[in-house]
């Protein structure tokens, strides 16, 4: 059975979803559904909000622009958020868009921008990050949207980190070049017990970490992982590490 019906249109809403409810579509959603997709009253689409699962909703039109979504039946129950918290030095616009979309597709449960010594982007557009997360979830049948944190200075993020949660650091100078072997050395093999309920993944900027930051990682107990013999761009390194984590302890 497919994860979700790829033949049906799918949209995200902020409102609650329940039988007997009625959701007024935003102007943008109404324009997209009625004018771009050419749907009409009585047609059905899939709707989700990140909390109440996925619902098949009937379109109800009133006039040329007003549109309501009426939940008819739940097609899938809500899934829990992913266990990976992705901490990253912010990237410039297009590359950040790409990173967010792919991280959501791969099941990251929380996105946490951290400001480092060599961070390229000075500002982070959280609304744009959320829009990219929603678009990826809509297109890929995902039910749980990641939490998106306010940007935080790296030292504050480390100070607030729960010592019981493993924190993996992508480090091209780490001892073991095979990422899966490195992860098993740090977390144990997948058959050694239940996978971590949560794991942090820390990816740095293009300029790398400063000496002071590396010392702070050691003090915080970060577990270093090398992602093979090649130097990867920031967005590639993070996604490669997510793939390795998911393959060994994730929700595949």
List where the protein language model places each region.
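N-terminal positively charged helical leader segments and presequences
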Residues: 1-77, 127
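N-terminal-biased segments
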Residues: 35-66, 155-188
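Generic structural signal for residues in well-ordered beta-strands
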Residues: 69, 145-149, 224
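RNA substrate-binding interface of SAM-dependent RNA methyltransferases
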Residues: 74-172
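Active-site/ligand-binding-proximal alpha/beta "capping" segment
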Residues: 167-216, 222-226
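Structured adenosyl-cofactor binding patch, chiefly the S-adenosyl-L-methionine
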Residues: 211-252
């Amino acid at each position: 059975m497919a994860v979700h019906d790829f033949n049906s249109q799918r949209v995200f809403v902020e409102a609650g979803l329940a039988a007997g409810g009625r959701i007024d579509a935003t102007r943008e959603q109404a324009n997209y559904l009625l004018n771009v997709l050419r749907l009409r009253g009585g047609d059905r689409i899939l709707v989700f909000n990140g909390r109440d699962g996925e619902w098949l909703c009937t379109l109800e039109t009133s006039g040329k622009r007003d549109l309501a979504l009426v939940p008819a039946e739940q097609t899938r129950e809500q899934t829990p958020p992913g266990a990976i918290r992705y901490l990253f030095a912010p990237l410039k616009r297009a590359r950040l868009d790409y990173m967010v979309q792919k991280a959501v597709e791969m099941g990251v449960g929380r996105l946490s921008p951290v400001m480092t010594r060599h961070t390229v982007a000075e500002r982070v557009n959280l609304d744009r990050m959320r829009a990219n997360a929603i678009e990826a979830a809509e297109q890929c049948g995902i039910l749980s949207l990641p939490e998106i944190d306010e940007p935080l200075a790296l030292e504050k993020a480390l100070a607030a980190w729960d010592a019981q949660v493993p924190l993996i650091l992508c480090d091209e100078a780490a001892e073991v070049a095979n990422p899966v072997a490195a992860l098993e050395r740090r977390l144990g093999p997948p058959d050694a017990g239940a996978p971590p309920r949560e794991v942090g993944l820390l990816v740095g900027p293009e300029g790398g970490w400063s000496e002071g930051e590396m010392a702070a990682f050691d003090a915080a107990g970060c577990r270093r992982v090398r992602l093979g013999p090649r130097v990867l761009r920031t967005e590639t390194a993070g996604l490669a590490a997510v793939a390795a984590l998911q393959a060994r302890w994730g929700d595949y």
